[in-house]
Amino acid sequence: MNDVYIIGGLRSYIGVYNGMYRHVPAEKLGAAVLQEVICAYGLVRIDEIIGGNSVGCGGNITRLAALEAGLDVSVPAVTVDMQCCSGLESIAIAAAKVASGQAECILAGGFDSASTQPRRSCHPNHPAYRGDENWYMTAQFCPQVWSEDCMLRCAEYTAEQFQITREMLDAWVLRSHALAGEAVREGVFQPCIAPVWGGARDEGIRPAMRPQLLRRLKPVLPDGTVITAANACLTNDGAAFVIVCSPAYARRYGLQPAVKIRGVVSCGTDPLLSPVGAVQAAEAVLTRCGLRGEDIDIFEINEAFALIGELFARQFPRCVAAYNPFGGALAYGHPYGATGAVLLLHAIEGLRARDGALGCCSIAGAGGLGKAMIIERV
């Protein structure tokens, strides 16, 4: 099997729901970043586009984004839905195609827009039909639960099962925003940001977040105790793509790889404990690669909920300093289908900033899923 390189890539600034991208459909946001990546790296031949998308309109929206971006009609495109894991799964699929010789260069990543997310309704034939005006935004992820707040309930249940307190969670919130604010001041991620559609900053970062503010917040669920609007990430708009290619392609076109992919893992867990998937996947990919947590210089773990940080610290107590050292999704946000590529780009830039060698990206997905990838700086 061939080695697989990531040359680099770009992400948009990440917008909050009804924020700076509120009138930008997901495919147009994705198209803009695709255009920027192609231009920035001078790509002349692309075999395929693979994009993750979780809450879009369906209908192979990645193909629509590719056509919006002006790619030649001969370049195929496919959309991946593994919910929050979609972007990282898209990159993993691209890597497998390159490793097996099916392709030499693929743009992979994803995009989503919470601001323009379609409302859906059950067909009258469906057992859950309750009338034409009974709209829903959240799909069903497990047989036991189907509600708009199911992920929040899973987070509450996970916190209860692992005896995680609100004070523990709020400490991770403060850490994430403080580190993200510092990263912005130092311009750590500026090289991987494409200021498309007028974006000028990541809208969710609050470096001045204070404990007093967090203590005033009420739980988001009427019967909840620990999950608040601060220790659960926001809903967001964003796009990110990376260049996945073979060593031969990189040599032929004079492209300098940033990292190579060392290993990839998918896993499943209890859907009602879905946040556990991020840590479980990280453990699994370390085992597959014959590594220990202490071997990793940067863990980019999607903190859809602050409790993921607490779960990580309990499983990897000696690696806390390497966990999201420039802040995580509690600050930057979580544009579902794009997040896997955002994690990878942050890991690449973070390794450069810290002169590190190995990075681990991991993410949990709705329905009890986990996806993780280990990269090595070239």
Regions found by a protein language model. Name each.
Residues C154-E156, C192, G199, R262-A331:
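Active-site pocket-lining segment
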Residues M1-A26, Q212-V276, Q280-E283, R288, ...:
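Condensing-enzyme catalytic core mediating Claisen C-C bond formation in acyl metabolism
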Residues R11, H23, E27-A32, A40, ...:
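N-terminal extracellular/periplasmic Venus flytrap/periplasmic-binding protein-like
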Residues R22-C85, E89-V98, A103-C105, F111-N125, ...:
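Conserved beta-ketoacyl condensing-enzyme motif
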Residues A26-Y41, I61-A65, S90, M151-T158, ...:
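Short, well-ordered amphipathic alpha-helical segments that serve as non-catalytic structural scaffolds
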Residues N53-E104, V145-C150, P211-L234, Q315-V342, ...:
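Conserved catalytic cysteine-centered active-site region
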Residues C105-Y157:
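Flexible glycine-/small-residue-enriched beta->alpha junction loops
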Residues M82-D112, A159-F189, V242-A248, P335-G356, ...:
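Active-site-proximal alpha-helical scaffold in enzymes
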